[in-house]
């Protein structure tokens, strides 16, 4: 029998936080208040933490004390990756998982009527992220001490958690099951037999031994040994060498896809799909849209044939309403449905993330409606969608919004605002002054020279690309080592630029949006904001407070706003900064603390990825000249580099190396 009563979910695991630090400053009161409110049943709270006050550490303390499965949502993959790394360090003994979109590249299916262009869905799936997604869903069904760090893709349709759990194959030594029955069960849950290329989501057979590689792992697999029609023993093995790592008393294998359905449901789904197709064809024909009628019939019949034969088809998610047995308009199952009822949600940088959650649904519907109107998809495809904001809210049992500048939405949800203003380093919010725009270039140059003489760095933020480029050229002419960071720069390059700034390869960084993640540089003692009085996204109260915060990592932090008038946003930002600074100074005086610039080691993933890229480039030269043995060695070396890159969450590099491994394998 498969699944159902076989998953023994551990309910009594405890979160165990490992850190050399103790809560300090106003962290203890923030932690205490948040925990008391959660235990007291409060639904929503805001942790309003200034930049550099250790919000992630506070979140970790809260998770440990509340001891509930927790979903942490960030507004992009890079930020999610940083948080995932931090939480993994804080909770080495618990399940810290990572759930983001598994597409390295994604071109959604679309239709442009004006040019009669149909764009087929095109994507490349990142195998490493797919593994981590499977690891997240299986952990949620197996234990209670789980933290999932996710991007907003966690509100997209995922498939039924009940079907996923019920389809799981449960194996124990002494269990009566024939080898062939196990093989059939594995194929049913979308595992693929491959006796040569043994990797994630595959199994191989050697006589009475079946070796299985779960979809949620990438290093160790399992060996199931049979004696007749009974399992003799189950071992964990090293997938590359086959070395036995020890016996296992119970093995649960979750499906290799999140979109699972059983035979009975499949038949019902196919019946409903065909009925919907006939209705749609009749409607098109009645409107004289014969091309659309033929298109939808041809397409649907092909997909249904694939579902009958293979149990799967490309774009199966578009039929998820029928697969899940949902009614029209009902929300899809998402990662949130894999959590138990009583779980905690933390929204990082909530002023950005909540806006994303709100906007996802409308953009998705506009694109899909075009596909339905022109016969590329059935109307039920509209129900393969992200959650609406109110549907997301219905999943919320308890939530903490985390931001230095909470948005209007969060403030409407709750009046409980927990402040965290004191930095463990004693650092103060920077002093802010306003200077006129007349002669600003010369004034700025003088300030830059004063900083660079002391070995400090400068951030300058402009409003337009042209101004950023002109200013860069001017400063270069004046002998300043300067770089302009524009929006087209990739994450990896951005990390490299920040590293060079910290190392002193250049002294001044100019950009339009310096609020991007990872741009925290302790060496920056001056932030100059040009056109501070031009109201807008980066010059509103929140944008200004966040930008001012970029100078709060240095004990000499200073901010100059160049403007001809003081706008309401500027005044509010200055008032808030002054309020915090006063509280911080009073705390430092009372406790005899002298502010210390953060000493942050200049080491990040770029150092390792650069080495790997150099090694990879070196290796590519002689591939074709290698003999078989040398190629095998090269494959092992590359796979090691691939795992290192993946562990550092540099999935782009990991994917490049994986492609090279596949190329090498194809030569044999």
Swiss-Prot record:
One of its GO terms (biological process) is nucleotide-excision repair. GO terms for cellular component: cytoplasm; excinuclease repair complex. Residues 36-423 form the Helicase ATP-binding domain. Residues 440-606 form the Helicase C-terminal domain. The UvrABC repair system catalyzes the recognition and processing of DNA lesions. A damage recognition complex composed of 2 UvrA and 2 UvrB subunits scans DNA for abnormalities. Upon binding of the UvrA(2)B(2) complex to a putative damaged site, the DNA wraps around one UvrB monomer. DNA wrap is dependent on ATP binding by UvrB and probably causes local melting of the DNA helix, facilitating insertion of UvrB beta-hairpin between the DNA strands. Then UvrB probes one DNA strand for the presence of a lesion. The beta-hairpin motif is involved in DNA binding. This is UvrABC system protein B. The lineage of its organism: Bacteria, Bacillati, Bacillota, Bacilli, Lactobacillales.
């Amino acid at each position: 029998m498969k699944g159902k009563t076989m998953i023994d979910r551990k309910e009594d695991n405890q979160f165990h936080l490992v850190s050399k630090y103790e809560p300090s400053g106003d962290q203890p009161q923030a932690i205490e208040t948040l925990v008391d409110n959660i235990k007291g049943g409060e639904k929503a709270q805001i942790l309003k933490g200034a930049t550099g006050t250790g919000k992630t550490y506070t979140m970790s303390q809260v998770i440990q004390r509340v001891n509930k499965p927790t979903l942490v949502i960030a507004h992009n993959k890079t930020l999610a990756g940083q948080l995932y790394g931090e939480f993994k360090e804080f909770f080495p003994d618990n399940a810290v998982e990572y759930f983001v979109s598994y597409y390295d590249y994604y071109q959604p299916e679309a239709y442009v009527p004006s040019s009669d262009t149909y764009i087929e869905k095109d994507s490349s799936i990142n195998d490493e992220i797919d593994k981590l997604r499977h690891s997240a869903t299986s952990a949620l069904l197996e234990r209670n001490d789980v933290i999932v760090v996710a991007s907003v893709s966690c509100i997209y349709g995922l498939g039924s958690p009940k079907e996923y759990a019920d389809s799981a194959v449960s194996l124990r030594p002494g269990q009566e099951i024939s080898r062939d029955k196990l093989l059939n069960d594995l194929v049913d849950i979308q595992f693929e037999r491959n006796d040569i290329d043994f990797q994630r989501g595959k199994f191989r057979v050697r006589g009475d031994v079946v070796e299985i590689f779960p979809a949620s792992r990438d290093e160790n697999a399992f060996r199931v040994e049979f004696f007749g029609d009974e399992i003799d023993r189950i071992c964990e093995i090293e997938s590359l060498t086959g070395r036995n790592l020890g016996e296992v008393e119970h093995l649960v294998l979750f499906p290799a896809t999140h979109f699972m359905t059983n035979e009975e449901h499949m038949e019902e789904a196919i019946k409903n799909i065909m009925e919907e197709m006939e209705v749609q064809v009749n409607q098109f024909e009645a409107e004289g849209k014969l091309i659309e009628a033929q298109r939808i019939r041809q397409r649907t019949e092909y997909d249904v044939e694939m579902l009958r034969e293979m149990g799967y088809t490309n774009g199966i998610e578009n039929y998820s309403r029928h697969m899940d047995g949902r009614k029209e308009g009902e929300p899809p199952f998402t990662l949130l449905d894999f959590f138990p009822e009583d779980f905690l949600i933390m929204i990082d940088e909530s002023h950005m993330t909540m806006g994303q959650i709100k906007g996802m649904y409308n953009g998705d519907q506009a694109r899909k409606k075009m596909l339905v109107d022109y016969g590329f998809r059935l109307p039920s495809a509209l129900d393969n969608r992200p959650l609406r904001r109110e549907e997301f809210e219905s999943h919320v049992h308890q939530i903490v919004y985390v931001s230095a500048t909470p948005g209007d939405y969060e403030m409407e949800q709750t009046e409980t605002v927990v402040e965290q203003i004191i930095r463990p380093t004693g650092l103060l919010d920077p002093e802010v002054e306003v200077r006129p725009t007349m002669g600003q270039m010369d004034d700025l140059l003088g300030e830059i020279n004063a900083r660079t003489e002391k070995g400090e760095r400068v951030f300058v933020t402009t409003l337009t690309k042209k101004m950023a480029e002109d200013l860069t050229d001017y400063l270069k002419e004046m002998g300043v080592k300067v770089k302009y960071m524009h929006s087209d720069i990739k994450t990896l390059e951005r990390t490299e630029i920040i590293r060079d700034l910290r190392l002193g390869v250049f002294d001044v960084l100019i950009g339009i949006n310096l609020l991007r993640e990872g741009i925290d540089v302790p060496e920056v003692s001056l932030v100059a904001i040009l056109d501070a009085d031009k109201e807008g996204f980066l010059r509103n109260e929140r944008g200004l407070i966040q930008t001012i915060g970029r100078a709060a990592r240095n004990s000499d932090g200073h901010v100059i706003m160049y403007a001809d008038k003081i706008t309401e946003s500027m005044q509010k930002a200055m008032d808030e900064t002054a309020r915090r600074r006063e509280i911080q100074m009073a705390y430092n005086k009372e406790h005899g603390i002298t502010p210390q610039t953060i000493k942050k080691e200049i080491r990040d993933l770029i150092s390792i990825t650069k080495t790997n890229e150099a090694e990879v480039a070196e290796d590519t030269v002689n591939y074709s000249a290698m003999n078989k043995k040398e190629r095998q060695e090269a494959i092992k070396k590359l796979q090691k580099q691939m795992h290192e890159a993946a562990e550092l969450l540099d999935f782009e590099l990991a994917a490049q190396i994986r492609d090279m491994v596949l190329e090498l394998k194809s030569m044999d």
